[in-house]
From Swiss-Prot:
Cofactor note: Binds 1 zinc ion per subunit.
Entry-linked SUPFAM superfamilies: tRNA-guanine transglycosylase
Protein name, entry field: Queuine tRNA-ribosyltransferase
GO biological process assignments: queuosine biosynthetic process; tRNA wobble guanine modification; tRNA-guanine transglycosylation
Enzymatic class: transferase
Keyword Metal-binding attached: yes
Catalytic site positions: 102 (proton acceptor), 282 (nucleophile)
EC numbers on record: 2.4.2.29
Protein's organism: Polaromonas naphthalenivorans (strain CJ2)
Start and end residues of each stretch annotated as RNA binding: 263-269, 287-291
Amino acid sequence: MLEFEVLKTDPATVDSEGAYLGSYARRGQLTLNHGVVQTPIFMPVGTYGTVKGVTPQSLHDMNAQIILGNTFHLWMRPGLDVVAQFGGLHKFESWHKPILTDSGGFQVWSLGEMRKISEEGVKFASPVNGDKLFLTPEISMQIQTLLNSDIVMQFDECTPYDTKGHITTEGEARSSMELSRRWAKRCEIEFDKLENPNALFGIVQGGMFENLRQESLDALVEMDFPGYAVGGVSVGEPKEEMLRIMAHTPHRLPAHKPRYLMGVGTPEDLVEGVASGVDMFDCVMPTRNARNGHMFTRFGDLKIRNARYKSEEAPVDSTCGCYTCRNFSRAYMHHLDRCGEMLGPMLSSIHNLHYYLNLMQEVRGALDAGRFGEFVRQFKADRQRGV
């Protein structure tokens, strides 16, 4: 089940210089089998059935509404038979709100020379034990049906920006996009055959070529998926290329369907994505950066292992209400990082995820109040100020 309602759109406004500040931003509500999600939303990534270093209770406390699971990695470990014992991911990982699972396409793509792609699917060696495996659109749908995720992603080929220094040509991007399009249809047929009660999203591909993006979009819209994603961005391309595709594609998707930008990105990317008409985001950046002492704040990024923080009594971000900032100093966080204590990345992950989720809450509030343009100006000024 999926119901999506656009509650409000960004009104056209002008700044003091008379510059147009209107955007494609919209405020929505997404109803899924395991709950209601307010959009725009950031979705923490739980690759192996867990958001790294963060308990489900902590995610609930920071108002996470939906998280991700990774079809490929959960297939590898613990294996489908184990998850099936629990009736799906929700009970297995004790998360009772919505879950989105990706199809495994990106992970198979990232195996590089260890995999072989054909019309039928992808042959590859298991990164766990070396077993020869075969993943097809049909098998991906079967796995995700067993996982019982609220949102199921089609199996696709992630078009790379470059391969060993060779930038993907338009012809190569077209072949990849057309394969993903054919796989989308096979996913749709298998999904319906399985009578999966959840929602299947199509994924727009096409590399950095706007004409291919449009062709992919048109074909997927004709299939009438409940929702759509923009894939194949943040895969090594220059930032300006990613922003160009973001500006081109999301707002052209059906206005009455949810739009998901996959694997993006920085706080600035999220705000830019909202302005481009995106409703849903995911990225490993908050937790991955946290494990490396890189923390996001309202006033720019903070690298906690820097010696300047050795004796600072202030919290990571004095404007933040997360558990970390309410209880611990920069000096303590610096100490944990320097000692390699596991509590360090746990507290840093709590902070970074809270920052991302709160940023989206502020975006929703600005859209509700009809002041998104004003919010964007203040957000940019604050982030550029520096800690």
